[in-house]
């Protein structure tokens, strides 16, 4: 009996000691980089933060020019802005991007708690490439869908991420896992992996894994799914008229794949589902979508980030940026993006800071979001694979473009090329007297250059990528007249306007080869052409692959990833 009592007493003392020592005492002068368990350090940091700092931590701002404005820099070092976004208008000079990131991170480290910035961009690959300069122009998601290999998704993301990581960018708003359901979707199109939800989910999960391996945080978008609308949420609030069962079995499927793989971030979309929520509120501002569905039903525990709140899809419903911000936080977002210059965000700041001071519930919601952001920052920045806080512009030539990546992107482009119609021009072996007309967009010089590497007897007919109806009509009549003097016409089709020009070659009795780039939808009914090749992007690798396939250098084995 005495022995049992002694064991019981020892057990009780052990439990008490375990409880006491499990609560780490963090000194008052600790900061973000102090060596303590992440969960406890996150609690400590949030407890030390003022309302100003808490609110700032859940904001992500962009800047208007090539370099951050003095006002944005002040937001970082005076208020503790938590995140910044690199947009396409900031990025023609990658060295300037790197130095801008370093400047902003240095300001973040001058504050007492030394919490670094999340630095994000949209580098999806293919059509969407916000960081330009010397970065790789890649085949893109639909090309990955056409090749069908998850390993292509993995390495596409891996090499894209290595390039932007060299610039100090630590978060990428990719992959896009919207199903290409509505074939008239102008905003998604080739950004999608395809129409099959399971397929999209598998490729999205592989893309995410490649990003993580390279040291960049991936972000799946646009929850709960942007693929079944022809409207663009930049200018409108799209309404998607499906019920919850359809949503669950189609739109949500790719997100389920990614949640199972512990995707660290998901972007909420400005999309209305009136059959699910009758008041028309966008998913990005909806507690039903973000808390009830994403958090509770799907079990997602990572960061939720809004799409840009300056898009009409958000502000049209909320009525003002300030109210949209409040609704976004109350719905369950952790980071709110506003792309405008910092001065436009002052009203957002003032009204929501006042609300924090008057509403305990709202303050607690902000605290919860700020804690989640800080916890993810602790786990990311203290890993051995984080992007540099202070990227060195002098070393970028060695890293951008990624040399290994260039080889991969060409091979991946070749795997993606789809012979939608083979015809008598595949392979194309013209005799020395054959007259060839190359018809393509002025903005795609690689189309003409790759053709002339293989076929010397070529003439050029150029038109603009973007044309009004009158210009397209004039070009259509002009190409009919010009094409009569040639035996074969090879035309690049990138949109409905260029497809209209191609249609005017239909009854001339000439051999016509259509090379489709971006979405293949405009050429799907052009069966009158002799040969149709699908390439899915206008990258130089894609044009090299398209002409390689046409020339018989390899077989075009890609498959159209649309239902």
Q: Where are these predicted regions, by residue range?
A:
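Bacterial N-terminal signal peptides that target proteins for export
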Residues: 1-9
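Bacterial N-terminal signal peptides
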Residues: 9-18
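Preference for extracellular/luminal or secreted protein segments
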Residues: 22-74, 78, 318-563
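Second-shell residues forming the walls of enzyme active-site clefts
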Residues: 50, 93-113, 127-129, 195-365, ...
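Structural recognition of the beta-strand scaffold that forms the well-ordered cores
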Residues: 57-62, 82-88, 116-121, 125-127, ...
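Active-site mouth loops of central-metabolism enzymes
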Residues: 58-68, 141-154, 236-250, 312-319
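A substrate-binding/cap region within the structured catalytic cores of diverse enzymes
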Residues: 144-169, 176-192, 196-197, 204, ...
């Amino acid at each position: 009996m005495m022995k049992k009592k002694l064991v019981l007493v020892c057990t009780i003392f052990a439990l008490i000691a375990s409880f006491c020592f499990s609560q780490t005492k963090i000194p008052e002068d600790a900061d973000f980089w102090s060596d303590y368990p992440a969960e406890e350090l996150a609690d400590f940091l949030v407890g030390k933060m003022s309302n100003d700092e808490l609110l700032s931590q859940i904001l992500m701002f962009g800047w208007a020019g090539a370099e951050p404005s003095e006002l944005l820099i002040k937001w970082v070092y005076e208020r503790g802005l938590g995140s910044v976004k690199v947009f396409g208008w900031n990025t023609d000079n990658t060295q300037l991007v790197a130095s801008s990131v370093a400047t902003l991170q240095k300001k973040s480290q001058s504050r007492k708690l030394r919490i670094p910035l999340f630095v994000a961009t949209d580098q999806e690959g293919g059509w969407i490439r916000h960081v330009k300069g010397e970065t790789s122009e890649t085949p893109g998601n639909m090309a990955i869908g056409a090749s069908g290999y998850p390993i292509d998704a993995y390495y596409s993301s891996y090499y894209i991420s290595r390039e932007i990581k060299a610039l100090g960018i630590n978060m990428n708003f990719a992959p896009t896992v919207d199903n290409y359901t509505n074939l008239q979707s102008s905003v998604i199109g080739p950004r999608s992996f395809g129409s099959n939800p399971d397929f999209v989910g598998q490729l999205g999960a592989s893309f995410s894994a490649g990003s993580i391996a390279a040291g960049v945080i991936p972000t799946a978008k646009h929850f709960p799914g942007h693929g079944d609308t022809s409207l663009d949420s930049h200018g409108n609030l799209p309404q998607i008229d499906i019920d919850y069962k359809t949503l669950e079995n189609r739109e949500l499927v790719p997100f389920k794949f990614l949640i199972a793989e512990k995707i660290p971030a998901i972007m909420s979309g400005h999309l209305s589902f009136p059959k699910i929520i009758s008041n028309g509120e966008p998913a990005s501002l909806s507690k039903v979508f973000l808390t009830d569905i994403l958090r509770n039903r799907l079990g997602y525990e990572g960061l939720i980030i809004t799409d840009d709140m300056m898009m009409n899809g958000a502000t049209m419903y909320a009525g003002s940026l300030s109210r949209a911000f409040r609704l976004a936080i109350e719905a369950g977002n952790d980071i709110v993006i506003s792309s405008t210059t910092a001065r436009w965000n002052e009203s957002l700041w003032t009204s929501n800071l006042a609300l924090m001071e008057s509403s305990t519930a709202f303050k607690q919601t902000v605290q919860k979001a700020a804690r989640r952001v800080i916890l993810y920052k602790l786990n990311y920045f203290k890993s051995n694979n984080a992007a540099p806080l202070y990227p060195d512009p002098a070393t970028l030539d060695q890293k951008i473009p990624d040399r290994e990546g260039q080889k991969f992107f060409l091979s991946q482009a070749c795997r993606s090329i789809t012979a939608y119609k083979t015809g008598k021009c595949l392979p194309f072996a013209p005799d020395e007297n054959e007259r060839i007309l190359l018809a393509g967009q002025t903005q795609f010089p690689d189309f003409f250059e790759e053709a002339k590497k293989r076929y010397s007897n070529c003439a050029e007919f150029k038109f603009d990528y973007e044309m009004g109806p009158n210009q397209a009509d004039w070009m259509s009549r002009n190409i009919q007249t010009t094409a009569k003097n040639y035996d074969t016409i090879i035309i690049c089709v990138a949109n409905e306007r260029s497809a209209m020009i191609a249609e005017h070659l239909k009854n001339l009795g000439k051999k016509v080869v259509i090379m489709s780039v971006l979405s293949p939808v405009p050429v799907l009914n052009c069966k009158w052409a002799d040969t149709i090749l699908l390439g899915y992007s206008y990258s130089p690798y894609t044009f090299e692959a398209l002409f390689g396939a046409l020339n018989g250098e390899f077989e075009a084995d890609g498959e159209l990833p649309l239902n």
